[in-house]
């Protein structure tokens, strides 16, 4: 059996199309143009690529895009002042500070300073607490995208045994909450978990988010399971060749056992920016007292 490939390119395009339709509706019916502000500190090449992609996709969806670039040696107070300004700007519905920040800057203080209503990365403790309480919250984009991808395979996740490998604040913990909201039965595993392969073999859904290339082997996977690979690990090419991007799952092995699987690249990574647009539209609606949009 060869697994169905869950195509991030197709799914993310569908999500962006729904976002664009919702943006058009907000403009036409309410005179609202959702606005996303992205703050980039320093000139990290990978961050530059991400910011350009976010800017392009934001504009393609019909939203307003605001970029703020600061030098790597910017004082913490100046960065905090910019966050306060964006919090107060009615044209801005979403604020994203590109992480990681350069050394010497306090990321936690910056995240805490973002208005939870505009926290489209879903990292502010208020949003984390609301999510854990089953209340409306802006959710970290990668977990949100992971759930959307799983639901292209299964109309309902209710009652399914789901294993989340990884307990980060960015992916693992919010993913557990989203799965609980879907009424899945959830196990969370981490570096201290005993006999991880045995746990994997019991799971109908496996979400791998550990940041270790090809850690999850094919013989760990329950036949027919759905595997969502969140990992993106850059590894040196053979004999000095071009670097490769590998997931946390040994894809070639796992696809012969799983029922459905996401590739790396071409999987969850593409959903992250699409879900950033989703969160921006949701934030705009909530800020203006409108019902949650159909995205």
Swiss-Prot record:
Record InterPro entries: Aminoacid_DH-like_N_sf, NAD(P)-bd_dom_sf, THF_DH/CycHdrlase, THF_DH/CycHdrlase_cat_dom, THF_DH/CycHdrlase_CS, THF_DH/CycHdrlase_NAD-bd_dom
Gene coding for it: folD
UniProt GO cellular component terms: cytosol
Molecular function terms, GO-annotated: methenyltetrahydrofolate cyclohydrolase activity; methylenetetrahydrofolate dehydrogenase (NADP+) activity
Any one GO biological process: methionine biosynthetic process
Functional note: Catalyzes the oxidation of 5,10-methylenetetrahydrofolate to 5,10-methenyltetrahydrofolate and then the hydrolysis of 5,10-methenyltetrahydrofolate to 10-formyltetrahydrofolate.
Pfam families per record: THF_DHG_CYH, THF_DHG_CYH_C
Xref: CDD domains: NAD_bind_m-THF_DH_Cyclohyd
Keyword rRNA processing set for record: no
Residues engaged in binding NADP(+): 166-168, 191, 232
Family membership: Belongs to the tetrahydrofolate dehydrogenase/cyclohydrolase family.
Matching SUPFAM superfamilies: Aminoacid dehydrogenase-like, N-terminal domain, NAD(P)-binding Rossmann-fold domains
Description of how the protein assembles with itself and partners: Homodimer.
Listed EC numbers: 1.5.1.5, 3.5.4.9
UniProt keyword annotation of Oxidoreductase present: yes
Record pathway: One-carbon metabolism; tetrahydrofolate interconversion
Catalytic activity, as annotated: (6R)-5,10-methylene-5,6,7,8-tetrahydrofolate + NADP(+) = (6R)-5,10-methenyltetrahydrofolate + NADPH; (6R)-5,10-methenyltetrahydrofolate + H2O = (6R)-10-formyltetrahydrofolate + H(+)
Sorted UniProt keywords: Amino-acid biosynthesis, Histidine biosynthesis, Hydrolase, Methionine biosynthesis, Multifunctional enzyme, NADP, One-carbon metabolism, Oxidoreductase, Purine biosynthesis
Protein name per the record: Bifunctional protein FolD
């Amino acid at each position: 059996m060869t697994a169905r490939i869950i195509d991030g390119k197709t799914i993310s395009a569908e999500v962006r199309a729904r976002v664009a339709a919702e943006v058009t509706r907000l403009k036409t019916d309410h005179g609202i143009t959702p606005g996303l502000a992205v703050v980039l500190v320093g000139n990290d090449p990978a961050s530059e690529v991400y910011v350009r992609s976010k800017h392009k996709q934001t504009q393609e969806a019909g939203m307003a895009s605001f970029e703020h670039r600061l030098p790597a040696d910017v004082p913490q107070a100046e960065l905090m002042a910019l966050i306060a300004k964006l919090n107060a700007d009615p044209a801005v519905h979403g604020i994203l500070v590109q992480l990681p920040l350069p050394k010497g800057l306090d990321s936690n203080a910056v995240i805490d300073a973002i208005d939870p209503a505009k926290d489209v990365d879903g990292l502010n403790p208020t949003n984390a607490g609301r999510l854990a309480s089953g209340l409306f919250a802006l959710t970290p984009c990668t977990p949100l995208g992971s759930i959307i991808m799983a639901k292209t395979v299964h109309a309902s996740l209710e009652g399914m045994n789901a294993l989340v490998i990884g307990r980060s604040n960015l992916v693992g913990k919010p993913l557990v909450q989203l799965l609980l909201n879907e009424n899945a039965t959830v196990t969370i595993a981490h570096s201290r978990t005993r006999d991880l392969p045995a746990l994997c073999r019991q799971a109908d859904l496996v979400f791998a988010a550990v940041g270790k290339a090809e850690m999850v082997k094919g013989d760990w996977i329950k036949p027919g399971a759905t595997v969502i690979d969140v990992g993106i690990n850059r590894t040196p090419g053979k004999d000095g060749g071009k670097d490769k991007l590998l997931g946390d799952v040994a894809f070639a092995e796992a696809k012969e056992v799983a029922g459905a699987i996401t590739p790396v690249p071409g999987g969850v990574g593409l959903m992250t920016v699409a879900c950033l647009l989703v969160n921006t539209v949701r934030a705009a609606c909530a800020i203006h007292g409108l019902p949650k949009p159909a995205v």
